[in-house]
Amino acid sequence: MPRSQDPVMRTRRFLEHLTRKYYERARVKLPGDFSLREFALQTWTGKSYLRHLSFASTEAVHRLLVEKAPRHFYYSSARYDQPGADDMDAKGWRSADLTFDIDADHLPECSGSIVEVDGGIEGKTSFIEEALCMRAAALRAQILYDILVYELGFDKSRIAIEFSGHRGFHVTVYLDDFDDYAKAGSDVRREIVNYVKALGLRADVLEPWTMLQVRRGKPIPIPPNVQLAGARGRVARIIRRLALRDGAIDIVKAVEGPSTTYSEELREYEDKARQLIGVEIDEQVSVDVKRLIRVPYSINGKTGLLVKPVTVDELDEFVVDETLSPFAREPPVRIRVVTSLPSSVTILGNRLKLREGDSPRLPAPVAVYLMAKGVAVLAQ
């Protein structure tokens, strides 16, 4: 690597070098209709985005990634007649997938654990408590998946979930041009957002249904069941997700099969599920019919981690650690911290206390994470 007097540029060149090494050996995951999509990227050494890119082959995509070694790489949720046209109106919009973005730092479980940092190379940045926050975000992704499948009727094979490479998850429903939802504008997509968030849902709708006990002639409450429609069915499916995480098989059986047993434990799970009835998603991402989204298996330049596909069941045990970095096999890297962190933080499973001027040698994934965040540079 060439040495530069500018530590920031030298750091970015180093990150670009590592990124190129990754793209030389790896392949990103593209949708089958990628030739109808617009692509965009930002390099490690530039501030502006290179947009209006289109490709006719996967090899052309690979060549560009090796050449540019981009910090960020995106493709459009929309399909176009002319995706490479510079003018958006000239592209000829055809349709768009449904896209959802879940950010851990927007969730109530995470709000009290965010560490804000000023004075970094990239400006203000922040760190989250990874285990707590990402577990909460993973649960929201599972709840969203269940809504899409069991309430909105989308085929499981069309739904993809990815770790964003930073602090959340992307959920995409891949659609064809002829699908009504694919042609839907922002207004219809906003209605879907409101439905997912359970906006306007009356509290009484969540109350237990009752049945008349013939022998005693009095109503008894019926536990929520995953086969039910509407809000009660959603509550039951959330209970199932929570119980599966905890290994509470009796609770899973109670909401999956016909049951009139309303145990105290089930009531506790139901109380938790009611609080999760609305999924906190980024509305702007979902209503935008021309959204740029990160390409699976590309590098997220905010952290140096991969945009990693995960299955809905893998979310139960999802953790952010060094295995999510494409640089796990690189040798340790010495960095110089350029701004102090006000408290210790956990980065990829490593608990760190960093002060300005510190020069630790760290595992490559952790060092890259800190340099990408702008709180450290490559040491001389």
Curated annotation (Swiss-Prot):
UniProt GO molecular function: DNA-directed RNA polymerase activity; metal ion binding
EC number: 2.7.7.-
Domain of life from the UniProt record: Archaea
InterPro entries: DNA_primase_S, DNA_primase_ssu_euk/arc, DNA_primase_ssu_PriS
Active-site feature positions: D101, D103, D282
Keyword check for Cell inner membrane: no
Manganese in keyword set: yes
Stored Pfam families: DNA_primase_S
Record GO cellular component, one term: primosome complex
The protein's required cofactors: Mg(2+); Mn(2+)
Summary of subunit composition and partner proteins: Heterodimer of a small subunit (PriS) and a large subunit (PriL).
Matching HAMAP family: DNA_primase_sml_arc (MF_00700)
Biological function: Catalytic subunit of DNA primase, an RNA polymerase that catalyzes the synthesis of short RNA molecules used as primers for DNA polymerase during DNA replication. The small subunit contains the primase catalytic core and has DNA synthesis activity on its own. Binding to the large subunit stabilizes and modulates the activity, increasing the rate of DNA synthesis while decreasing the length of the DNA fragments, and conferring RNA synthesis capability. The DNA polymerase activity may enable DNA primase to also catalyze primer extension after primer synthesis. May also play a role in DNA repair.
UniProt name for this protein: DNA primase small subunit PriS
Gene name of the encoded protein: priS
